[in-house]
Amino acid sequence: SYASLIGFALVAMAIAASLRFPPQSQSEQHGGGRPLGEIARQPVFIVAALSAAVGYGVMNLLMNATPLAMDFCGLGFGDTAFVLQWHVIGMFAPSFFTGHLIARFGVLNVLFAGALLMAACIVIAVQGITLMHFWWALLLLGIGWNFLYIGGTTLLTEAYAPAEKAKTQGLNDFLMFFAMAGSSFFSGVLVTSAGWTVLNQIAIPFVALSVFA
């Protein structure tokens, strides 16, 4: 229930209050470094920001449309809840080992795997409209988002010096959440006007962009 969220929020507040961050260096406190435009033109920044933005944008585009699409396909509320529960598991459960995968196989390989998982999600989604089609598609979508988001933000740390950290991360967050907001705005409109299959097809160029970045 909504009341339980109060308890979760209080626990989160207590944990956050107990955190102790290392003090910032002088360069971090006063900023400086290269102009933001120069940082953003680096290939490493482009790949990192693009991966995170595509991960968030495509995930949000398809996830937000899923309840409507499943309703249009005659699937019930319980089916929708089941699919979205597993989607959320796919989003966050891999976080326990994504860092280890990055350390072992390299961040670029993890990003590539995330893009391939999103591509697999689309392939499954356009093949049919049964419960299992939605379940597999949304599960893979969640795992793909995890790899692209964590991989992208990990790679981003190679794009800046300590004095440039705040503005570089700020730009990355802006691009990422701009993609998220845009996909949220168009998701419902597209699935109701064009359909679930077309919505997935629209996501293909963005996923391809992250694959070949």
Question: Where are the model-predicted features located?
Answer:
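Intracellular juxtamembrane helix-capping segments at the cytosolic ends
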Residues: 147-161
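Structural signature of the two symmetry-related core transmembrane helices
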Residues: 109-124, 204
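A membrane-interface helix-boundary motif in multi-pass transporters
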Residues: 1-6, 189-207
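Helix-to-loop junctions at the C-terminal end of transmembrane segments
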Residues: 93-107, 191
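A late C-terminal transmembrane helix in Major Facilitator Superfamily
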Residues: 159, 164-193
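Juxtamembrane intracellular "pre-TM" segments in multi-pass secondary transporters
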Residues: 21-48
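Pair of pore-lining "gating" transmembrane helices in MFS-fold secondary transporters
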Residues: 41-61, 139
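C-terminal membrane-cytosol helix-exit motif in multi-pass small-molecule transporters
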Residues: 6-26, 213
